[in-house]
Structure formats: C-alpha cells, structure tokens
From Swiss-Prot:
Its EC number is 1.4.4.2. The keyword Nucleus does not apply. It comes from Stenotrophomonas maltophilia (strain K279a). One of its GO terms (cellular component) is glycine cleavage complex. This is Glycine dehydrogenase (decarboxylating). Keywords: Oxidoreductase, Pyridoxal phosphate. It catalyses: N(6)-[(R)-lipoyl]-L-lysyl-[glycine-cleavage complex H protein] + glycine + H(+) = N(6)-[(R)-S(8)-aminomethyldihydrolipoyl]-L-lysyl-[glycine-cleavage complex H protein] + CO2. Its cofactor is pyridoxal 5'-phosphate. The modification N6-(pyridoxal phosphate)lysine is found at residue 702. InterPro entries: GcvP, GDC-P_C, GDC-P_N, GDC_P, PyrdxlP-dep_Trfase, PyrdxlP-dep_Trfase_major, PyrdxlP-dep_Trfase_small. The glycine cleavage system is composed of four proteins: P, T, L and H. It comes from the Bacteria. Belongs to the GcvP family. The glycine cleavage system catalyzes the degradation of glycine. The P protein binds the alpha-amino group of glycine through its pyridoxal phosphate cofactor; CO(2) is released and the remaining methylamine moiety is then transferred to the lipoamide cofactor of the H protein.
C-alpha cells in the first residue's frame, strides 16, 4: 500500500456520525479557535475547566459506531423483546396511532425539535394543538379548565392530592384513597405524601363516607373495571370541607357521565389510549382538569388566549406566576417538562376521529368486552358487572390461565392466585375475544352473542351531555384535511428544523434521525410496562447498558432511569439524600442550601421532600459565594441535609472552588447534589461523581439528545454514589425504602433508545469533542459579540463554559430597549430568542451547543450586530425611541403589506433587516402578544370561530 493510500480502517469512517453531529468541521474549528485565542480544543478546555476536576483518562466507552452499525446493534437488542397482545390494562391500553399522526407529528422534526412555548409569537401552532388538548380534557371530564399535560397518571394523582391539600376548607392532614385505584398510583401517592406530612388512608368508598379527610381520590372506572356511582359520596366529602379528585379514562367518558357532572373538583388521567403506544410505560401525556376556582393553584403549563398588538387572538402560556421557576421555594409542585409531544398526538387523534369517531371506538370496545363477558359467564366463569372495557374474572387458577393465554399469544393482568383481569381496547378484534374465551374453556359465537347481549354500563351513569362540539373536532376527518391542518400549524412555529434555538440552559442540540428511528419499532413501542420479565429482555439489556454508559460519563456508581423529567430526577435525588440520613438516625437533617442563581425547580423539589430551603449568595463575578456557604454550613451544621448547586453554574462559568464546597458540606454532615442541567459542558472532560458530588440528575433531553418535543417528553435519570444507591426509586412490587417517583418502573422507557444511539454513535472521543465544541461555540459567540454586547460573567482567562449571558441592561438606560425587545426582534431575523431574564433579569443567555455550524453561528451573530446598530440609531436619535423596529417587533406579513404604514421607519427595515432574509424568511403568525391582557382574561379552551373573522379589507 502506498504512503498516500488511506487504510481500510480510515475508509470505513467509523466516526462519520461524529462529523454529522458536530456542526463546525475541523477547518472551521481552527478558524474559530483563532478568534477565541487558543491553538487547539485541548488548550481551550484547559483554560476553561479547573485542573482539579478534569478527568485524567478518556471515557471507558467503545469507539464510535456508524449509523448503520448502531441501528443493527439496537435492532438485535430490540429483537430480544417478545411482542404479545397485551390485555393487561391497569392504565395502559392498546391503540392504533393513525399513520398521518405517526408520520407528521411523532416522526416530524417540526414538532419534536421545538422547545417549550415561552416565546408565544413563534409557538402559535403547537399552542393551538395544546389548546385542543385542554379542550378535549375539559370537555370529556366535565370540568371548566384543563392543563397542557402532566408526566403520567400517577404523578397527576399526586399533584391532585397536593392541590386538594392547599385548596380544601378541611384542616385534616388525611387524604383518603379508593382501594381500587391503579397500584402504581397508590405507590406514588405514598412516596409523595410522607415527606409532606400527609397521611394516606386507603379504603372502600363506603368507608370514605365517614372519613375525616381534606380530599378523596376515586378511580372511575376503577382498576378492576367496575363503574361506580359516587354522587352521594362526593356530597358527603364536600359537606366536611374536602375536595374530590377522580382518576379516569378519557375513552370511557365518551359513554359515561363526566365526573364534573356528579361533583368532582379535580379530574386526572392518562391520554395514552388516544393514539400513543404502550412504550413499556411511557412517555404518555397525563392531564389534570379542575374547577375554575382552582386554576391559580393548578400545577403544570396552561395555554391561554390573549390578543396581539394588532388586536388579533393569540395564544400564550398563561398564569405563569403559578409555576415553579417563578415561585421557587414557595412552589407546591416542581413540574417543568411535561409531555407536550404526546399531548399533541392525543389532541390530533381526537381531532381526526371527532366525537362520533371516538364514541364509535368506545362503543366497539365496550361491545367486545360485553360479548366476551357473556361467553365467559355462559361457561360458568365469574365476571364482575358494570364495566366499560375491563373484566375482573374470579374463581380461576390464575397461573394456569396465564400460561394458556401466553401460549395463545396474550398477556392478561395478574391480580392474585384466583383472579385475572382482561382489558380490551381499540386494537381488539373478533378473533381476539374468541381466542381469549378459549383460554377459559369457553366457546364464542360473536354474532349470536352480539344479538343477545346487553351493554354492561349502568343506566344511571350514561353520558347525556355533548362534547367536542368546537369545529376543530368536526372538520379534519379526511386525511387530506388533517395533513394540511398539521402542516399549517407547523408552519406557524420555529423549531430546530428551521433554525438554531440558542436557549441558555436548554441544550437544543441535534436530535439525529438515526437516533429517533428505533422509537417506533413495535419491539419497543408495543411492550406493556407490566409484561413478564422474559418478554422484556431487550429492554433489560438496553436499560442496563445505558445505565452503565451514564455511570461512566458521570463518575457515579448507580443510575435510575425511572424519573421522567429533570425535575423528577431532582426529586428522586433529594429523596435518596433524605432516606440516607434517616437510615443513619439523622432524620432531623432538613436544611438544603441553594444558591440564589439556581434553577427554580431546585427549591421547589427541596420543599416537596420536606426540606427547608436556605438561599446562599452569589458573588460579583457570578460565582457561588463560598464564604456564605461556609457560614451557613456552620450555622446549620446539625441540621444540614444537602446543598443543591448547578455545575458549571447557571451563570455559564466553571467555578474554581467546587471541590472546596463539597468538602465544606461533607464536613458538616451534608450531601452534595449537583444539578446536571449543564452536563453538556462536562461529558468526557470532568465527572461530578469524582470531584466530591454525591448525586446528580441528568437531562437525557438535553445532553443526550432526546428531543424537547415542544415541552416534553424528557428523561431525568438520577445518578448516585454507592452509599446512596440503596435509596434510588423503587419499582412496582419492589418498592424499597424510597418508593416510586414515576408511574412506570423505568419511566419513559420507549425513548431511551435515543440516548443509547447517541452515545453509541459518538463513542468516547466523539463525546469529548462534542463537549469541547459546545464550549468553543459559546466562546466564539461571546468573543464576536464583545464589541456590541457585554458578556456578564466569565471564568478564568476570560472564557465562559458552554453558554454566555449577554447583558443588555445598560442599553435600556440609553435607548429604552430591553431584553424582551431584543428577543422579539430576533424573530424578524428568523431566530428563536435566547433564554430571557434567567438567571439574571434583563439579560439574554445563549447556548449554541456543538451541533450548530459556523454558518449558523455567524447568522445569529450578524442578527445581533444589526440589532445593536438599531439600538445605536435609537440612541443617536435616528430612530424614534418609541416607534422603532425593536419596540414593534415582531412584524407580521399582514402588518408590512397593509395598505397603510404609519411607522417612522421603512417597511423593508421591519421585514428584511438583513438582505439574506429575502432568500428565506420566517413570518410570525401574530404580532407581539399582550401578556397582561392574557392573565386578566383567562381563557384556556378553543377560540370561538367568530373571533377569526377578518376585518374588512380595502379594495
């Protein structure tokens, strides 16, 4: 082989994916390093990261795989799962995902790469979809308002419990739980209640009649399928000052009287059976609906209707002062990431089928269940009555039944030794009920029994009220119509398929197509979370190997993948610390130190664990004030439980004293919790588990490439050192000392292949390079913008970590232009704004990630420089201080093409501030949204059609 001939190994190009994932190529990296002032990535990293925390050796992970190799490897893992027909129920049901929704939402980056809709003007499409979801949930439950999704049904039930606690007139500390709620719901309630001083009492509805409690949770239909009449019970609870929460099934409510109609105050549930697969437990969009009186205490995101600057209807996140990122230690919930992508799917399932289609699916499911029940009874098998879709079969040898069922290709619910459950669903066929009947020794003539069998729903609980009457649910029933509706919504929004999203602390990096492909494979998507272990061997291998990968990346000793959001990972980590102290006879340790720059979820999670939050100071350079930490650690030495700190800090710098801080906390008996929100600055460079940290949560939807989905799904694994490992979240049936923090034992399991694929395709060297280029991109932006905008905080050598805070506060004094004006003006350039006013009010925090190319970085920089020039023009008097392109941003196509233009600047400056925008232009669908109007006039359901009537247009 000649000297110039590349080797076969080079030609195999094993690091091809690394080059696809990382935006700048090597030549561009060299060019950018020159701007930053360093000769190499390693030299730059040495100048950024404190030497005492740097990892001495490369990650002990395999080298990178190609996309083809990784897909083949994960296909082999998936094939170890066994897909049977699962009629287990217990909150999870088979469903058909309409292909138009599968392809155009779940597999469409216009939907799955979007961020939480904080910037209303560029999020109108997905907020309309979420308004549809809220309307769906409110209509079917008979409530006045519903939120834009929660993490899972069990979490929603726990949130209902705490909502009832703070809203009920009763002063009792007892929450009464129906003994026929789903088991996973009861386990999570136990986890959540004890640290908050809530006493759970579990019993029958009859026992609840006389109970003194601030709240009651009912399941309707219950976990065994029974449909109960609870009107008298609800009245009794109300008479004693309590509130009633109901966990329900949306499909059943197309046939059954809505809980709101018989007195419920709060209704929760799971929308999974509206087109979202099992996924071994998630992700699925739960919901909460409640009476209007409780809307300001309701957890989670809430989409409302306001008006824009031109008086047109516009959607926005409403009542945000309820949320954890604002209320912090006064919050009563730490919900942040929810399940927006799945809520969008469920809403469009309802839009596609409409009320008649949903009712038809429900009637067919109930009809099949009624026919099967009749066949079993005819064969002498005992079956409960008054059901929707679930049969409780008693008096059988359960082990024998399960063995026969599995041999026939079916999973039934394991209840006890002499009873089983059978939950039918949209996917059930005639052949299925014939086969299941045969398992019990029953024969079944479907047509004959159909003609002779009555429905099994109680006559007094049949739904009489209309639902989903809004035109959106009665229009898009052909595939063409839905396809075009989805396209029209996607076109209103900015997601990563169109532009960089430079949100600080959010890590909006590439969600590669190859990573997404396994998610919809039946071997992952069609596995019920409660199948026998031998049917989920592929999932076991996937979970075990991913946990090992994360252990290696973090330096910890054990990982739980159960938390289904970053906030839940925080909660799990703090519960582990709490349980550890209690195991050592130090349960009195209840003080949690939290810097004032911390994420809002940190203090919210701490108070949910029964801890008292003590806020520590930040110094003038943006660093955690070590002396203030030392003083507080000494002051609360006997009670110190933990410190929660983000590293690198939320101010975008690597603090030099992190090891010293860990030593201070440990000296006083506390544990160190390191928030993993900024792990994208660390992978392959430093490991928190090696510098003294005891526990972290990670964000797989940030660092490890699960897409944000417009506000979820997420996965927030909890990683711990060995001494905390026994206190990781328990699993259903094996609860452990802490209990469950999510409904499913492995959380949102079906999206774990995304992170597995990312790590496998990047390999040890690719992961380190990704971290370094993330640092480079942030510093390149900071250096290029330095003559125009000051970077508020830098670390040693004048460098930032992986994000930078641009300070626009001085400009507000000289021009009247604030950070929000800059954020809105960026929309005219086709950009999603950076993070606004966090962690410092009046600033913009920029995190470009490693995936953005030099071209895209320069496009953003050019936009920011042009904005600075416009601010200069205001300062100089060339642009009016009030009537200027920043104050009036964003500019809609309607505004700039109107026959009359009254502004003191030209239309071209409004629409095309840079010439390059004439080649490709994003037009926001609405002008600047009025936040004050939206909070004063709360409306959280579909907009009446007449609100869209056009004003008269001049000829």
């Amino acid at each position: 082989m000649s000297q110039n001939t590349p080797s076969l190994r080079e030609l195999e190009h094993h690091n091809a994916f690394v080059e696809r994932h990382i935006g700048p190529n090597d030549a561009e990296i060299a060019q950018m390093l020159d701007v930053v002032g360093h000769a190499s990535l390693d030299a730059m990293t040495d100048a950024i990261v404190p030497a005492k925390i740097k990892s001495p050796a490369p990650l002990a992970l395999p080298e990178s795989m190609t996309e083809v190799q990784a897909l083949a490897k994960i296909r082999a893992i998936a094939d170890k799962n066994t897909v049977l027909r699962s009629f287990i129920g217990q909150g999870y049901y088979g469903t058909h995902t309409p292909n138009v929704i599968l392809r155009n939402i779940l597999e469409n980056p216009a939907w799955y790469t979007a961020y939480t809709p904080y910037q209303a003007e560029i999020s109108q499409g997905r907020m309309e979809a979420l308004i549809n979801f809220q309307t769906l949930c409110a209509d079917l439950t008979g409530m006045e308002i519903a939120n834009a999704s929660l993490l899972d049904e069990a979490t929603a039930a726990a949130e209902a419990m705490t909502l009832a606690k703070r809203s009920a007139k009763s002063k009792s500390d007892t929450f009464f739980v129906h003994d026929a709620v789903h088991p996973q719901t009861l386990e999570l309630l136990r986890t959540r209640a004890e640290p908050m001083g809530i006493v759970l009492r579990v019993g029958t509805p009859a026992e609840a009649l006389e109970a003194e409690a601030f709240g009651l949770l009912l399941q309707y239909p219950d976990t065994f399928g029974q449909v109960g009449d609870y009107k008298a019970l609800v009245d009794a609870v109300h008479a004693r000052g309590g509130l009633v929460a109901v966990a329900t099934d949306l499909l059943a409510l197309t046939l059954l009287a809505a809980p709101g109609e018989w007195g419920a105050d709060i209704v929760v549930g799971n929308s999974q059976r509206f087109g979202v697969p099992f996924g071994f437990g998630g992700p699925h969009a739960a919901f909460m609906a409640c009476r209007d009186a409780y809307k300001r205490s309701m957890p989670g995101r809430l989409i409302g209707v306001s008006i824009d600057a031109q008086g047109n209807p516009a959607y926005r996140l409403t009542l945000q002062t309820r949320e954890q990122h604002i209320r912090r230690e006064k919050a009563t919930s730490n919900i942040c990431t929810a399940q927006v992508l799945l809520a969008v799917m469920a809403s469009m399932y309802a839009v596609y089928h409409g009320p008649e289609g949903l009712t038809r699916i429900a009637r067919r499911t109930h009809r099949l269940a009624s026919i099967l029940a009749a066949a079993l009874r005819n064969a002498g098998v005992q079956v409960g009555g008054d059901f929707f879709d679930t049969l409780h079969v008693t008096g059988v040898h359960a082990d024998e039944i399960h063995a026969k069922a599995r041999a026939a290709g079916y999973n039934l619910r394991a209840i006890d030794s002499d009873s089983v459950g059978i939950s039918l669903d949209e996917t059930t066929t005639r052949a299925d009920i014939v086969a299941v009947a045969a398992v019990f020794g029953a024969s079944l003539d479907v047509d004959a029994l159909d003609a002779s069998t009555a429905d099994a729903l109680p006559a007094g609980l049949l739904r009489q009220s209309a639902f989903l009457t809004h035109p959106v649910f009665n229009t898009h029933h052909s595939e063409h119509e839905l396809l075009r509706y989805l396209r029209s919504l996607a076109d209103k929004d900015l997601a990563m398929d169109r532009t960089m999203i430079p949100l600080g602390s959010c890590t909006m990096k590439l969600n590669a197509t190859a990573e997404m492909i396994p998610v919809t494979w039946p071997e992952f998507s069609q596995i019920h979370p409660l199948v026998p272990a031998d049917q989920a061997l592929g999932y076991k291998e996937l979970i075990d190997t991913l946990e090992a990968m994360l252990v290696e990346c973090t330096g910890y000793d054990a990982v739980s993948l159960q938390p289904n959001s970053g906030a839940q990972g925080e909660y799990a980590g703090l519960l582990a610390i709490r349980a550890y102290h209690r195991s050592r006879g130090e349960g009195h340790r209840d003080i949690c130190l939290i810097p004032d720059s911390a994420h809002g979820t940190n203090p919210a999670s701490a108070q949910m664990c029964g801890m008292k939050v003590v806020v520590t100071k930040t110094d003038a350079n943006g660093n955690v004030d070590v002396e203030d930490i030392r003083l507080n650690a000494e002051k609360y030495s006997d009670r110190l439980a933990a410190i929660m700190m983000t590293y690198p800090s939320t101010h975008g710098v690597f603090e030099e004293e992190v090891v010293e801080i860990c030593e201070i906390i440990h000296k006083h008996g506390g544990q160190v919790y390191t928030d993993g929100a900024n792990m994208n600055a660390l992978v392959g460079v430093a490991k928190p588990g090696k510098w003294g940290s005891d526990v972290s949560h990670l964000n797989l939807h940030k660092t490890f490439c699960i897409p944000h989905g417009g506000g979820g799904p997420g996965v927030g694994p909890c990683a711990v050192k060995e001494h905390l490992a026994p206190f990781l979240p328990g699993k259903l049936g094996d609860n452990g000392p802490v209990g469950m923090v999510s409904a499913a034992s492995f959380g949102s399991a079906s999206i774990l292949p995304i992170s597995w694929m990312y790590i496998a395709m990047m390999g040890r060297e690719g992961l380190r390079k990704a971290t370094q280029v993330a640092q480079l991109n942030a510093n390149y932006i900071a250096k290029r913008l330095a003559p125009h905008f000051k970077t508020l905080y830098t670390g040693r050598n004048g460098l930032v970590a992986h994000e930078c805070i641009l300070d626009v506060r001085p400009l507000e004094k000289t021009s009247g232009i604030g950070a929000e004006d800059v954020a809105k003006r960026l929309i005219d350039f086709g950009f999603h704004a950076p993070t606004l006013s966090f962690p410092v009010a009046g600033t913009l925090m920029v995190e470009p990630t490693e995936s953005e190319s030099l071209h895209e970085l320069d496009r953003f920089i050019d936009a920011m420089i042009q904005i600075r020039e416009e601010i200069t023009a205001i300062e100089d008097g060339r642009l009016d201080r009030e009537d200027n392109p920043l104050k009036n941003a964003p500019h809609t196509a309607t505004a700039v093409t109107a026959s009359e233009w009254t502004h003191a600047y030209p239309r071209e400056l409004a629409a095309f501030p840079l010439a390059s925008l004439k080649q490709s232009k994003y037009w926001p669908p609405v002008a600047r949204v009025d936040n004050v109007y939206g909070d004063k006039n709360v409306m959280c359901a579909c907009i009446p059609v007449d609100a869209y009537k056009d004003d008269e247009v001049e000829a």
